[in-house]
């Protein structure tokens, strides 16, 4: 209980330091990580090691992806391609249905693509849509964020659900089937949250981007900007490559284990796939490409814009790693495991661990390990029950995304949100969506178990 209270105080410090005191989130998170570790009784050397490993590991896994995504987004915006693409999406969906379109796109993209990578890839499209429709950036950003999260935590082939299915000996096909159903229900709740709550928070889509990119719209009127199909290729090609890699890694090994599999496994890695997207984005420039590639050109501006996002995301990873090392996840999981809550138990354990240490994947895997020996006792050891337990764990792994979650910082920093707004929208949104998903799992279990 002491660790839980300490965590609550630490989160309050982060929020107050960044909103009231105006401290940069990077410093606030590092201070919080070190302070929590020391007050939790961790050896000082272990605290520093956890900070370094968490910071470096997070940047190592997503730093290049954020940089590449920033470059793609900058070229899309300044070439006029994002505007053309936004016009096309608006023509299909209509201005009133932009949040629904972003949510569905996120739900589909996150089936094979990590939610943070998907948000990086699609955030420039969301910004362009908000600018074109003249609406707040917050609505589409939260709809996209929650849409990505729905499938990321509940539907294979993302690593968390796959690992949980393996630990619990659940049939992967059943997990996919129930996961798709429950995540679709969660998607609907996320969309409703976006249009009823996030829409009340105005975030100017022209803010938070380099000044030079704000003149993008002018390029669209002179006929020099790329068409919508050309503009979407830097987004679709990386996604397609990542999808192929995920398919190739399925247990059935559809591409075999030879040279073709090796090629797909290489080009489908998120880093390589996004770099391919960067190369395609360069083709969006109609004239004077060379001047765009230097330190003072579009590439340089994109790297500068991404730098702040990367260090904040890395410090969020450092905070999460310290929490993992403190043992708070074990404390929460062990206490909840003694309760008798049926299908709600895996959700609550996963939610507690997720809230405590930030990583959805760690939450899913840890909870699956805790639940495995309890399934027979809880009468949840049938094939269908095991699959639903995996989905329930995934629902819990959404609750909640806050300051110790690197995805929280990706969403807030790419969407122009301060910490308080992020808590109001991203954190509360994941609470609503995860709870709705868990309720859906429970209701389904009443009829099929």
Protein language model regions, located:
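Membrane-interfacial loop-to-helix junctions in multi-pass transporters
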Residues: 1-5, 56-62, 89-104, 132-140, ...
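Long, contiguous bundles of hydrophobic transmembrane helices that form the permeation core
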Residues: 177-297, 449
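Alpha-helical transmembrane segments of multi-pass membrane proteins
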Residues: 95-111, 133-153, 171-180, 184, ...
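Hydrophobic alpha-helical transmembrane segments of multi-pass integral membrane proteins
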Residues: 63-69, 92-125, 310-316, 339-378, ...
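Juxtamembrane helix-boundary/capping and inter-helix hinge elements in multi-pass membrane proteins
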Residues: 42, 77-82, 92-96, 128-140, ...
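Hydrophobic core segments of alpha-helical transmembrane domains in multi-pass membrane transport
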Residues: 6-18, 30-38, 66-71, 105-109, ...
């Amino acid at each position: 209980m002491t660790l839980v209270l300490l965590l609550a105080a630490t989160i309050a410090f982060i929020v107050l330091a960044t909103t009231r005191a105006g401290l940069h989130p990077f410093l606030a998170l590092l201070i919080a990580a070190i302070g929590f570790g020391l007050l939790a009784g961790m050896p000082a050397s272990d605290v520093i090691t956890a900070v370094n490993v968490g910071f470096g590991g997070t940047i190592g896994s997503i730093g290049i992806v954020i940089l590449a995504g920033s470059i793609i987004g900058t070229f899309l915006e300044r070439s006029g391609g994002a505007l053309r693409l936004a016009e096309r999406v608006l023509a299909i969906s209509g201005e009133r249905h932009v949040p629904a379109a972003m949510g569905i796109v996120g739900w589909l993209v996150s089936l094979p693509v990590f939610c943070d990578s998907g948000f990086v890839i699609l955030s420039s499209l969301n910004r362009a849509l908000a600018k074109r429709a003249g609406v707040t950036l917050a609505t589409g950003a939260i709809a996209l964020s929650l849409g990505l999260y729905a499938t990321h935590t509940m539907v294979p082939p993302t690593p968390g659900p796959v690992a949980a299915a393996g630990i619990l000996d659940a049939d992967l096909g059943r997990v996919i089937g129930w996961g798709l159903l429950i995540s679709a229900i969660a998607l609907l709740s996320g969309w409703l949250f976006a249009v009823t709550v996030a829409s009340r928070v105005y975030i100017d889509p022209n803010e938070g981007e380099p000044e030079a990119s704000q003149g993008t719209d002018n390029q669209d009127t002179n006929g020099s900007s790329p068409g919508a199909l050309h503009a979407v290729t830097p987004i679709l090609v990386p996604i397609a490559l990542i999808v192929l890699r995920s398919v190739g890694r399925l247990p059935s090994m559809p591409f075999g284990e030879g040279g073709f599999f090796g090629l797909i496994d290489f080009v489908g890695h998120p880093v390589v796939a996004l770099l391919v997207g960067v190369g395609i984005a360069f083709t969006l420039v109609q004239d004077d490409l060379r001047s765009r590639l230097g330190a003072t050109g579009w590439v340089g501006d994109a790297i500068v814009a991404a730098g702040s996002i990367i260090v904040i995301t890395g410090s969020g990873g450092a905070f999460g790693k310290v929490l993992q090392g403190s043992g708070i996840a074990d404390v929460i999981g062990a206490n909840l495991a003694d309760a008798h809550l049926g299908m709600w138990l895996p959700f609550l354990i996963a939610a507690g661990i997720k809230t405590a240490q930030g990583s959805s994947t760690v939450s899913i895997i840890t909870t699956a390990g805790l639940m495995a020996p309890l399934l027979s006792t809880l009468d949840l050891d049938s094939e269908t029950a095991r699959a639903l337990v995996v989905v329930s764990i995934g629902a819990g792994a959404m609750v909640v995304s806050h300051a110790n979650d690197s995805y929280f910082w990706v969403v807030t920093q790419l969407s122009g949100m301060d910490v308080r707004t992020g808590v109001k929208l991203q954190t509360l949104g994941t609470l609503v969506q995860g709870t709705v998903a868990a309720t859906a799992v429970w209701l389904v279990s009443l009829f099929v178990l």
